[in-house]
Amino acid sequence: MDAEGLALLLPPVTLAALVDSWLREDCPGLNYAALVSGAGPSQAALWAKSPGVLAGQPFFDAIFTQLNCQVSWFLPEGSKLVPVARVAEVRGPAHCLLLGERVALNTLARCSGIASAAAAAVEAARGAGWTGHVAGTRKTTPGFRLVEKYGLLVGGAASHRYDLGGLVMVKDNHVVAAGGVEKAVRAARQAADFTLKVEVECSSLQEAVQAAEAGADLVLLDNFKPEELHPTATVLKAQFPSVAVEASGGITLDNLPQFCGPHIDVISMGMLTQAAPALDFSLKLFAKEVAPVPKIH
């Protein structure tokens, strides 16, 4: 999907509520610095100072819209950034520009960092000749999941399930609580009805076969080494060709190609949201017609 079209996925009401909570967190009371800047009309240039993928425009826009400011973008969502790049301009009352500055930069930097990591992972997978799905996980920051899942999509990865209601995931603790793989999958199938798929986390070929026999749609081979993963997936697919196989656990950008194989359908990576470094952006007010280019430290 075109990155610019992904903004349609974001519910306006949810987006507005998130932005409101972020701004209230940063300034719940008196804003003394507003007396320094004043309320005169001002303009600021948004600069990208590190390479990566630009992501998070809808959040950036929503923050400044709530503060009666206008954003003009010079690069589309999903663009590859080559520093130093002038990405956008923001216009509005000075105290409003500065009130939204840090919240907007934090959101854009984090979202772009995740999109950049996702894009690198997809590129590594395609470079290995693999055409399956690179996906994120539910290992996201509480209260910030919408931004992080959106960043995955801009980077070309799959978001995986958004929340507990998107897929019935039977994990190891569910198996223990239910009293075995078969009982757990049976209960999951009954709960899922015809609307949801059931995925089962497995730590051995035996568990994977039990899960598939019990009716799992997807089998998650968790924390398998590559030399164990591919033989297990081969045997499983031979017996259950319609069952999708997901690999997860300990997968990084460096070792990702080792997990790519003809019997692996999905590779999920927690590091895409947990370890992706934020990109470096700055927002600089300027008085002249041409904004000065910031230095990279």
Swiss-Prot record:
Activity toward QA is slightly repressed by phosphoribosylpyrophosphate (PRPP) in both a competitive and a non-competitive manner. Competitively inhibited by phthalic acid (PHT). One of its GO terms (biological process) is NAD metabolic process. It catalyses: nicotinate beta-D-ribonucleotide + CO2 + diphosphate = quinolinate + 5-phospho-alpha-D-ribose 1-diphosphate + 2 H(+). The keyword Transferase applies. Belongs to the NadC/ModD family. Hexamer formed by 3 homodimers. This is Nicotinate-nucleotide pyrophosphorylase [carboxylating]. It comes from Homo sapiens (Human). The gene is QPRT.
